[in-house]
Amino acid sequence: MGYKFLAVLSVLISVAARAAQPALTTQAVVDRLKPADPGAVHIAGRLGDKIGLCIRSELLSQDVERFITPYREKREIGGADWRCEYWGKWFTALAMADAYAPTAESAGIRDRATRELIATAAPDGYIGTRQPQYRTQGWDTWGCKYALLGILADYDRTGDPAVLQAARRQGDVLIDEYGPGKTNIEDAGEWNGLPASSVLEPVVLLYERTGDRKYLDFARHIVACWDTPSKRLKGGMRLIEDALAGKPPAQFCAPKSYEMMSCFEGLCELYRATGEARFLDAPVALAESIRQHELSIIGCGTSGEVWFDGTTKQTGVVNKPMETCVTATWMKLNYQLLRLTGDPKYADELERNLYNGLLGAMTPRGDWWAYFSGQMGVRVPSYVQHADVGTSCCVLNGPRGLMITPSWAFMTGPSGPVINLYAPATAKMESPAGQAVVLEVSGDYPVDDHATVTVQLETPEEFSISLRIPAWSAQTDLKINGESIPVRSGTYAEIHRIWKTGDRISIGFDMRGRIVKAPDGNGQIAVLRGPVVLSLDNRLTLARPGSAVVATDESSFAKLISDPPAAAQIKAWMAFDVVFTVDGKPQVLTFCDYADAGNAFSQKNIFRTWLPQPLDLQKVYDCGQTWQTLSHANHWTDVPKK
């Protein structure tokens, strides 16, 4: 009786969620993997705690008035003024939080924030922070993009026609500014037009929600401008051509990482709207080039917010490494490509960034983030970019990367549910026949080396459940009700059968200690376990005399011994004693997960990930990555007090 009630409730939740979302009748392409419905996924365990902390401590606790005031006053002028982006970044994350865990409080904040923003519109419909004479300059169009993204996010939650009308008016302003015969969008704002051009994404979303062809025509016009000469670029931006040619990202028209990927997010949406292959081929090619040239073991690497051929430079001192805005946007681009292609490599990349670079940037209090994250040194809280608003770009972008997690953790493919993430969770899905299917994932992945999925549905039904087999898991043990199923790393294991309530899927992962060698061959190594990078932390492993070399077995894996007391000591998720040979004798060095290494966010709390071999233990933390290389500020910045 209890389960029947749960199944009915699941259907009602899914129906209600779909009813609230406007139908998109103008999409030419259907996603190969569709995100779970709003509210259908609940993540538990450590990851769920982090998501909940972010919602409570940051997204629901913001002073909305601070975000709205710059729109009311319209005083921004120059290139150092980007308050125009803050409301939209915060609001898009809030809307995802409201979809994930809807409450009266979140709905009330969402409604008020949208209402008050729309009320700031100029007579022509412009929602921004500048007077007419300063529009299209600096970061203005970039900010208009974020306002439009936020307004459309509210419309997707409510279906309110007044909200859509405000979005249309904002779109019309953009057409008046950059449409045919108007200013070339390549000449607008900063970085050779990259930030302004990223308005492509909400313009396509506006077309999909209105069916009004003028917005699609405008989107095509924006892309066409990329191939026309501009005042700053004789050959134009050439984003699509350079991506398809495999050009390294650092050699594009402007190497600004975050803004570049934002343009390609827009191309993903344009592919959905048109079905034109090049609009997908280009983002796929860019992502592959980023994988080849810019990724680090903890995620998406940058220096000073730009691409710099970072893969081969990650083991040394990097000036202002791995901006959190870049990490979040790289995750969002991978999420788009996962939806459109169904290729599990994008889910692998989402997991890598989630458990390492992204969570590593989040402060333990949950309301603040690092601006830059290195692979050694200290954790430095982001500085406040604009004191009147009291925040920074990265503090607001971190939640955007985190809040997409429920949408890609469980998805729906052509033949049934798809499981991408094995953190403890419950997902209320739908079978191909429309029946409610509840998937419960138990265990403590990735601390545990296994997870169990329990299937619940009212009537037995034949369909497929697909499970991501991570590329890093060389030996994966998959069983259905005790029966072994062969799998291959880096693919989906599609299990087609008649499913019934109580069926159990058990999956064991290869959590041996992997030794990764420095990409540039400089002799350094890093230790990984599953999707998690491990780091030394000076609260667990003290500097002392000795020369250490990691000990490996005949298969070149390191021996890891779980050390829960060490993890508890520094409030880390996990800790392991790793066997090294120190001055010819076996000893252990204690590592913790990278995301919690340095989590005191203090100048005294030093960590290190890449390790020279042999490692001089006396100088293990003398790495040269000072806090000054991890901050835009000229003084140490603490997490602001509430």
Model features per residue range: what roles?
Residues 219, 283, 348-356, 361-451, ...:
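C-terminal beta-rich recognition modules with glycine/proline-rich loops and embedded aromatic residues
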Residues 483-489:
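Short beta-strand segments within Ig-like beta-sandwich modules, predominantly Fibronectin type-III
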Residues 132-141, 148, 164-194, 200:
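Asp-box/WD-like beta-propeller blade repeats and closely related beta-sheet repeat scaffolds
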Residues 178-183, 188-239, 243-251, 256:
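Solenoidal tandem-repeat scaffolds enriched in leucines and small polar residues
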Residues 21-104, 108, 137-157, 196-214, ...:
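Aromatic (Trp/Tyr) and acidic
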Residues 6-14:
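Bacterial N-terminal signal peptides
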Residues 475-482:
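Short, surface-exposed beta-strand/strand-loop-strand elements in extracellular ectodomains
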Residues 90, 104-140, 165, 294-302:
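Helix-terminus loop motifs that line ligand-binding clefts
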